[in-house]
Amino acid sequence: MRQPTFAALSLLLVAPSLVAAVPHDSTSTSTSTSTRSPSYDPDSTAAHDTTTPHTPPSPWRRLSEAIIRRIGSLPHENHLQKSMLALATGPSSRAPGKQWVAHYGGDVVLRFKMQTADEARALSQAAATLFLDVWEFNEDWADIRLAKDVLPSLLGLLPRSLHASYEPLMQDAALVQAIFDTYPSSSASPSHNTNRFSPNLRPSPHHANGHPFFQDYQPLSVIDPWMSLMSSMFTTHVRKINIGISYEGRDIPALRVGVHPTNKDEPTKPRKTVLITAGLHAREWISTSTVNYLAWSVINAYGKDREITHLLEKFDFVFVPTLNPDGYVYTWETDRLWRKNRQPTSLRFCHGIDLDRSFPYQWNGDQMGSNPCSESFAGDAPFEGVESQRFADWARNETESNNVEFVGLLDLHSYSQQILYPYSYSCHDEPPSLEDLEELGLGLAKAIRISRKGHTYKVTSACEGNVAFANKEKTVLPRIESSGGSALDFFYHELRVKYSYQIKLRDTGNYGFLLPKEEIIPTGEEMLDAVLYLGRFMLGEVGWARRRSRSRWSAPDRGTGDFDEAEQVAIEL
């Protein structure tokens, strides 16, 4: 890989000293945020609106944007002329060339609508038999990508009732163009593709504005130095950490954001921490960009926004933009639609393990079949996926050795606009804190929908969000693919993270994993509203803390095994 230029590295190295010489708004943090204003309204949208459209950007903001533009202009890897990024950024035209057509031109994405158990079972078996790429599925439909010349074979395995129950979502030139457009273009202006429209995607006024880092999807070679920059520029409340090492030897970087108490006379309680993760599935780029947007928004708002400042004083937030760095790099260099990690399997020509099927809780890779060529291959044993085990080991070490208590998990994925709570492995077993999970989930969905005119997200269990139902009584139809061994269930059940959610971001299928880059900021904005609502909920400003808890949940055993007073005796208004 070509390395960053000396000038760029020098800029990164001197950035902290340059920033130190710039007057910061956060210098007044210790006095201005220690006491919350009497007029503070935790439910007010304006309370966390940090935008000031008529105010010139501060010097540190201009400096950070200049550095980020420099990072973003660095050359990327193009070994053996196989880099997909080089193909996207090389030509001045925004039309895909022959290489793109040869790679994806024969594919089609079809949406099947199932009504009966026989139809669901037949589609599930056919997808497994033909090694098809199942993009998404829920109670209404299943989206499957396949080569067009495989379609006759697929229909031959399906009942006749399904022969007329599918429709193409993307095919031929449209699919190739959608893939091509997700890569950045060195020649395109920020307003590129302003006329793109989908019935499920409202045109956004934000696509040509805002931070330059979020005008495009970014490769890992840009994300990593950007994270280092954030840590260097905001030393009071940001620290870059390493979750672990991937199979191919890459770091799994994260940003820990929070302000720790300085009073050493009082015993230090376990630091309540919220995990916000993305990228378990490599091709879900919007999840990675959204985590970066959330981190940037929270980091920049500290000392300026009362609500976010208060949250960072009470909680740590750990932002992990990609838990699957090897797979993510592969989507930039070779195959945009790659899903799994990149470790070898028992079949030399079939690489990768589905990291979100590799966790040990209710792992069922042996029951679902062990086919390394499957997109949802769970490995031959629990934790065979290297990155899954590294993530779990890090989290356990945090709780056992570093005085951390994980109180929330938001694991971002795409697509289908759903907020999913445990369990994923079963539609029949109920989590002990079901009512609290449902209540908070509905609150998150409402915060997304109303605060910034966001989209509608469905709230349900992860199992019910990933199966089809035969009727209104929810007779569960056969699964399209396994949902055992998920990160969601593992963190909820094994690490006792009470508020654990998997959130599937925009859209509902018109673009699927190929969400236009113009939707990065709008998606980030609506998720920021969800994160702020989560914070209010955990602080007791909305939801469960206004009345007595109804759940059967038992807290992690940290000596006494009890909740603290605010949690154990909820306030009734």
Swiss-Prot record:
Residues 23-60 are annotated as: Disordered. GO terms for biological process: cell wall organization; proteolysis. Residues 216-538 form the Peptidase M14 domain. Zn(2+) binds at H281, E284, H413. One of its GO terms (cellular component) is vacuole. InterPro entries: Peptidase_M14. Binds 1 zinc ion per subunit. Residues 23-53 have a biased composition (Low complexity). Keywords: Cell wall biogenesis/degradation, Disulfide bond, Glycoprotein, Metal-binding, Secreted, Signal, Vacuole, Zinc. Residues 1-21 form the signal peptide. This is Inactive metallocarboxypeptidase ECM14. Glycans are attached at N397. It comes from Leptosphaeria maculans (strain JN3 / isolate v23.1.3 / race Av1-4-5-6-7-8) (Blackleg fungus). One of its GO terms (molecular function) is zinc ion binding. Substrate binds at H281, A282, R283, E284, R339, D356, R357, S414, Y415. It is found in: Vacuole; Secreted. Residues 22-186 form a propeptide.
